């Protein structure tokens, strides 16, 4: 049986944590930041976890990460 291809777009956007859950970056951080509050921008730093509903689908896209 052939190897499963990794979806390259997903590989750049998601990482797996040590426990196997999928981490993601936050949206709304690349441009048009002047009208966003300091608090809002601060809370968008770092990573978040992908919702439980989407975990299975994204894990299939990045099988070897």
Curated annotation (Swiss-Prot):
Pfam families annotated for this entry? Answer: Ribosomal_L35p
Ranges for region Disordered = 1-51
Q: What are the alphabetically sorted keywords of the record?
A: Ribonucleoprotein, Ribosomal protein
List the record's Gene Ontology CC terms alphabetically: cytosolic large ribosomal subunit
Under Gene Ontology molecular function, one entry of this record is:
structural constituent of ribosome
| An example Gene Ontology biological process | translation
Known InterPro entries for this protein? Ribosomal_bL35, Ribosomal_bL35-like, Ribosomal_bL35_CS, Ribosomal_bL35_sf
Please give the Gene3D superfamilies that the UniProt record associates with this protein: 4.10.410.60
- Name the PROSITE patterns for this protein: RIBOSOMAL_L35
Please list the residue ranges that the record marks as compositionally biased, kind Basic residues. 10-24, 33-44
Concerning its family, UniProt says: Belongs to the bacterial ribosomal protein bL35 family.
**PANTHER family tied to this protein:** 54S RIBOSOMAL PROTEIN BL35M, LARGE RIBOSOMAL SUBUNIT PROTEIN BL35M
Q: Which NCBIfam families match?
A: rpmI_bact (TIGR00001)
Q: By what name is this protein known? A: Large ribosomal subunit protein bL35
Record lineage: Bacteria, Pseudomonadati, Thermodesulfobacteriota, Desulfuromonadia, Desulfuromonadales
Give the encoding gene's name: rpmI
